[in-house]
Amino acid sequence: RYIRRQRQMCIRDSDGRIWVPKSKGDQRKPKDIPENERDYYLERKYPSFGNLVPRDLASRNAKEVCDAGYGVGSTGDAVYLDFSDAINRLGKDAIKAKYGNLFEMYNRITDDDPYETAMMIYPAVHYTMGGLWVDYNLMTTIPGLYAIGEANFSDHGANRLGASALMQGLADGYFVLPSTINNYLAEHKLDNLDDQNEAFISAEKEVFNKLEKLLSINGTKTVDDFHRELGKLMWNQCGMERSEEGLRKALEELPKIREEFWKNVNVPGTSNDLNQALEKANRVADFLEFAEFMLIDALDREESCGGHFRVESQTEEGEALRNDEKFAYVAAWEFSGIDKKPKLHKEQLVFEEVKLSQRSYK
């Protein structure tokens, strides 16, 4: 996973070049494939930016060439990230100074030397977009509830980088909260609550019943089995590229997976001790509900925007095509219950100083 995610860091620099063989199923070693038989597809398609295109473009194109049969490696789900030109141009020491840590980790995991051969990479699921709204003091719309780090939206746009994620967590935790949350606590008297409160009793009973239900199923499939099945469905139908056909197919398949989960999952252990299998079962149960919201939202938004790319909404050059007239709003879906249609809430996006325009990386 680490190797796959590091592509996003390397690709931001012009030293690494991404390519695949021009012939499908070419199993030769990268060094044995001559230049005229290589397709530097990002440089070919986006000559102005090449390998420095935004990550949504780079990721979508990588999956596209792999799905078309040009991928490399034993699974065919990889493309080459090649530093040979940069090494020849700048020298090994210069590249080592910039990427030595990454190259060393890749070598430890794969036993391949990136200084001698191209690395194999493939896009992986990254952070979801957005975050909770917070005010200047990092408090959400719920009084007393603060959101810090990547849980809030304050420093992140649609595309996130790991370094800025770390930065935000440190900044919020070390510098902002100590100066803001203390003021709130000093000004607000906390109510005296105990475990006999009606709300607590109701919530505790609901959680206990859910835990016992998960433990009592005693089925034949593990939590990981369902997690993997759900992940594959979402990756293929609601990942970097979405289509109406694929989203509708996923909306048909998801309830079946969810139904089987609650009938056939096997969660070992008890609820009386630390039980990581039970913890994960709870998370996957949540994923099975949240995934449906993602599918419904992706199907409803008939445009391409940011990381949401609908194949029906693209330019002749294959770029994301927005529909600002109909979809210039933030969508929030209200949960109405399992197998019930959620309610859509809209907040219009109004731009007074900036004119919306079509992006291009040609």
Regions from the language model: what does each represent?
Residues R1-I11:
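Single conserved hydrophobic/aromatic residue that forms the stacking wall/gate
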Residues L90-M139:
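Accessory "access/gating" subregions that flank catalytic or transport cores
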Residues R1, L90-D93, E116, R160-Q168:
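Alpha-helix capping and helix-loop boundary segments enriched in small/acidic/polar residues
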Residues A86-N88:
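N-terminal export/ancillary region detector
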Residues I3, S74-T75, Y115, T141:
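Short, structurally constrained coil/turn elements
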